[in-house]
């Protein structure tokens, strides 16, 4: 199987295709079960064999903390990119607690969340504000922002790195440093024109040019817009986080198209809100509206 993966990769590259394999690293070179959480000579053939890359992602089992550094070093030693090793987090069973985040700060390694075969675990933990549709959605959006941007929901104001956060409660997540501590923003926005109306893909009504065309609840991820890269990167003119920073979020009470819109509220002296990371080739003839 290892040789098959390598051959598929080589052939795909020869015809301009991409071939990707993501592998949960609980097997030995020979194929027997090995639940150890380190990467070494007994497992190396699943990532790198005969000086060829075998899989694109090799996720370490969840107790990788004590061996993270040696696993990354061994990957480099055999010629592999250490960032093809992924530190696994079992967020279904342990939320964000099982692996030591502090270890990853100085380790060349990527991060993988294992959740559930059928359910987004952030959504699964989003009943804290109530069980109604709007309450669950509001909680889900906030927890998304805490997971990725940190407990303050602003990547420019991340809490210190903290291990052992086993609860998904708002209070516990207020102390989480966020994935932004480790992962710089990337962008799929490559070309103009670019249009977003901040539609989440659901709503209490459906609007077109601001007018209600369907008066009932709905959802359709196919009409979800591109949503902000950063939620919410807010600074003043000195790149400091303002004490009176504007509040940002989404509202279902109004929309230009679909079911939601960007909502900003509060009184602020200066709040610069960065929304999207882009790779546009902008010219003097382009317009922003």
State where each predicted segment sits.
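Chitinase-like catalytic core of GlcNAc-active glycosidases
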Residues: 1-70
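Acidic (Asp/Glu)-rich catalytic clusters
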Residues: 50, 75-81, 104-106
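Structural preference for beta-strand elements that scaffold enzyme active sites
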Residues: 18-22, 57-59, 82-88, 110-112
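Extracytoplasmic/secreted cell-surface and envelope-processing proteins
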Residues: 30-35, 66-72, 95-100, 120-125
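Glycoside hydrolase catalytic-domain groove-lining segments
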Residues: 67-90
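Short carbohydrate-recognition loop motifs
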Residues: 243-280
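Extended repeat-based interaction scaffolds and adjacent low-complexity, acidic/S/T/P-biased segments
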Residues: 288-289
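Substrate-binding cleft of secreted/luminal carbohydrate-active enzymes
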Residues: 85-245
């Amino acid at each position: 199987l290892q040789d098959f993966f390598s051959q598929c990769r080589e052939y795909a590259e020869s015809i301009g295709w991409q071939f990707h394999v993501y592998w949960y690293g609980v097997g030995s070179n020979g194929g027997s079960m090995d639940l150890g959480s380190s990467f070494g000579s007994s497992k190396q053939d699943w990532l790198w064999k005969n000086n060829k890359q075998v899989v694109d992602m090799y996720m370490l089992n969840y107790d990788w903390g004590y061996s993270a550094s040696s696993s990354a070093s061994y990957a480099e030693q055999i010629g592999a990119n250490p960032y093809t090793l992924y530190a696994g987090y079992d967020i279904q069973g342990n939320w964000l607690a099982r692996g030591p985040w502090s270890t990853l700060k100085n380790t060349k390694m990527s991060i993988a969340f294992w959740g559930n075969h059928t359910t987004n675990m952030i959504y699964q933990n989003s009943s804290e504000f109530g069980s109604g549709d709007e309450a669950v959605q509001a909680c889900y959006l906030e927890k998304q922002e805490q997971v990725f941007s940190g407990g303050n929901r602003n990547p420019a104001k991340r809490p210190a790195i903290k291990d052992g956060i086993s609860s998904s409660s708002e209070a516990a997540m207020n102390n989480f440093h966020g994935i932004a501590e480790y992962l710089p923003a990337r962008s799929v926005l490559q070309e103009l024109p670019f249009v977003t109306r901040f539609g989440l893909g659901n709503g209490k009504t459906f609007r077109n040019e601001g007018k209600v065309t369907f008066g009932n609840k709905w959802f359709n991820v196919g009409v979800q817009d591109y949503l902000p890269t950063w939620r919410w990167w807010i600074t003043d003119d000195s790149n400091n986080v303002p004490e009176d920073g504007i509040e940002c979020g989404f509202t279902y009470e109004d929309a230009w198209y679909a079911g939601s819109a960007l909502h900003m509220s509060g009184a602020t002296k200066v709040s610069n809100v960065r929304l999207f990371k882009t790779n546009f080739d902008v010219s003097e003839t382009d317009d922003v509206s």
